[in-house]
Amino acid sequence: MRYFLLVVMILSVCMKSFSQTKITGRVADKDGHAMEGFVTLNIPGESNILSFADIDDEGMYALDYNGSADSICIRVSGFQIGNYSKVVANRSQTLNFMVEVKGINLKEVDVKADPVTIKGDTTDYLVSSYQQQGDRVIGDVLKRVPGVEVSKSGEITYNGKAISKFYVEEMDMLQGRYGLAVNNITADAVSKVQVMEHHQPVKMLQGMGRTDEVAINLKLKEKAKGTYVLATALGAGISERQGKGVRGLWNEELVGMYFGKERQTMQTYKGNNSGDDILAELSNQYGSAGLAPVSRVHASGPGTPGVPQKRYMDNQTHALSHNWLERLDKDKEMVFNAVYSHDFQNREGYTYTEWYRPEADAVRLHESQFSTNRSHSLDLSHRYTDNSSRHYTSNALSAHVSWNDDRVDGQIWSQNYNSIVIQRMRSTPLRFYDKFIIQRRMGDNVLRFNVFGGYAQSSQKLRVVEHEDSCRMQELMPRTISLGAFTSYIKQFRHVRGEYGFNGRSAIYGEEGMLMGHADLNAEDCRNRMWYGIYRVSVFQDYTYMYKRGDIKLGLPVALDAQSSNDMVRHNRHVFFRPIIQPSLSVSYDWKVYNTLQGKLHFEQQVGDFNSLFHGYVMEDYRTVLRSQVKDMFTRKNINVSGNYQHSNALRQFFFNANAGYSHTWRNQIDALVYDGIYSTSIIHELHNGSSSVFTGIGMSKNFSWKKCYVKLNVGYSHNEYQRLIDGNMMSCSGNLGRINVAGSITPLRWIGLVASFGGMVSRTSCGRSVSDMVKDYMGRISLKLCPIEQLTLNVSAEGTYDNWNAKNHYRYFSDAGIQYSFRKVSLELEGNNLLNQKKYVMNRNDNMDMYHLEYALRPRNVLLKVRFNVL
């Protein structure tokens, strides 16, 4: 520990020793009146802006510069004053400007706003600079904003970092379901996209050290404020059937929204059977409440291919949401969110699997399956927040209930097995959770108090019928109860902030279940009825040293765990006590103006795991049963080291990030697989084992004003080493994975747009002396947009995929087309999908030396016509 603290002190002294130039001054006219504008700093003879500041209401400005240049150029600019500059020595000083007001004849001036402006940690992107013909919603524009990425799941990242908050007019109505805003607020309604780095949503903590969070705020145009908008879309079409004939398609939308100063609302209904994934926008990208019942049981059905869901999803889906925010005063607000969905899906596919065995031939299995999945889901949440400069109070209550019914009919065959297998799985998850937070600021210090509690359960039943005289059934009811309280005190010592706290929590897990129909197993071994409790008391102290260009953080939490287990079937009771220490260290440094370096070191411990304590058999799916044979508590220790470099130059619209990391894990338990024909038993044994991983990645994006061009690149590589226990043989295994994604866009002429993308993945694994074949998957897509007139937009796209595993058909091709025509306030959209009528998609995967070959039925060729218009 002495050496650890010595390193921290040396780093602190080194960071503080970097010299810094501070330029301050006032900008005024000859009469002393403050003028509006901004001030920049650059090296004489160079165009790169190294520092930037706005002139405040008093005419004052302040610039910071870290560099070794002998001289620097300070430039003042403004709409009414023109440009003024001075070259001065590189030293801290006061530099005032006396400027002259210049009259401007607006009729003779073409005023064009800059696409990017920066004020402190906030970067404004002018939507009109990135919007193109045919862009309907703000999500279409976000994909072109420099540094912004929108993943397939809907998650938004900025220069490789996931956003932590999404606001509309500085209000978070959607509470993480920001896909509703991205996919429904029209692009014409948004003026600017604001990216806020080092974002601190709690006002009383602002100025007490910077965070590593990123947030996005949509600034609306005046015409979009204070007006209720109700928009609808009605769609109908036809699709070929897998056999013969055609079937009808429908696609409906109704969206209402209101954005005012004191109130925001959004109501949505969407439904279709045309393959559109309308549930993705309802996902909470902030994460769930952190409380969920244990789920061990599922029906094994066709997997999902690596193509957009619209290509394969045979669905009937309905989704409704109601979102409401009321601002009670400038600090207080209430938010209510309700989401309901009903989803019915058919899936059809064929899977060939080879399970690796070190001392025997691989287990080979063919599965031809058809599944139907039905679900109903309801989510309710309410949040009250009082967020002022002196105190913060928040209470968040959430509830979730769903009903799921899955049926899988399949023909299963292997070397010595051939049978019809019917699986029926039903589950009803239920969850309630509440979290209360109160914080008070006392001078430069802060007192915090949090309390939370929740309950979750899930009734699960899996029924498997094989042949005509064989029926197995697994019933399971897991429950979770969680309670906790947390309090801390933050003390500010000039450049050092210390946080000292106490944390107490308890989590109680219960499970009751029975496996029926296994005549070869003892009846008592097929029952589970147990309770498991974790009771933790911890104290912690966190220190943050803050300097002008970054900070150093040191965390020293210490905890004592008391854990108890009670197996009421086997009459076994155990109590364990374990100390836990989890120190962490992180360093952040802003290098020059646009560069940030970060390093993190973290040691973690986990003691106890409910999933390792059940001693009765549980049928996971029709092929696999699970069981634990351990007596001691599960223990896991993990050390993580990572580094990150970010370059963010919004003015030049260039972003780059690189990261690398290493992780090593020690465990005292391992899952052992034992095969018996196509069936397997997974047994948890007490056996020390370890795993390690190395990863590295690079991301880059660059926008050009020339031809509205942009280029994006993401490259990554990971290497993993781990151990497996199969049929009593302990093996050392490793896996390598490389990936690349490239995308670009260009508009060579006003009426032509071209977008191209390419993605690829290469993987290989090994266990013992066995090495798998290389698995390669590539996908490329090119889209052409034509805009012959302002009201008409034509889109044509072609897509190709390749894999090296299927010798008969390496390549697959797809083509789609669309026409959009707008007149007055009505928009007509005609789309055709899978015009080449591909019947199936082939995908291959290598996982722990197990090989998976998937053939999945795709949606046949289809055409859909949609009419959009505003009701209000």
What are these regions (language model features)?
Residues S19-K22, R26, K30, E58-M60, ...:
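Membrane-proximal, glycine/serine-rich, low-complexity loop/turn segments characteristic
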Residues D29-G45:
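Short, ordered, surface-exposed loop/turn motifs in non-cytosolic proteins
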Residues N42-N48, C73-K86:
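A short, solvent-exposed loop/turn motif at the edges and junctions
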Residues E46-M60:
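Short, acidic Ser/Thr/Gly-rich low-complexity loop/linker segments typical of extracellular
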Residues Q206-G207, G243, Y269, I278-N284, ...:
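Outer-membrane beta-barrel translocator domains and adjoining extracellular loop/strand segments
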Residues R448-A456, P478-E512, H518-T665, S783-K785, ...:
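Structural signature of Gram-negative outer-membrane beta-barrels, strongest in the C-terminal barrel
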Residues E524-M530, S538, S628, F634, ...:
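Outer membrane beta-barrel strand-and-loop segments of large Gram-negative receptors
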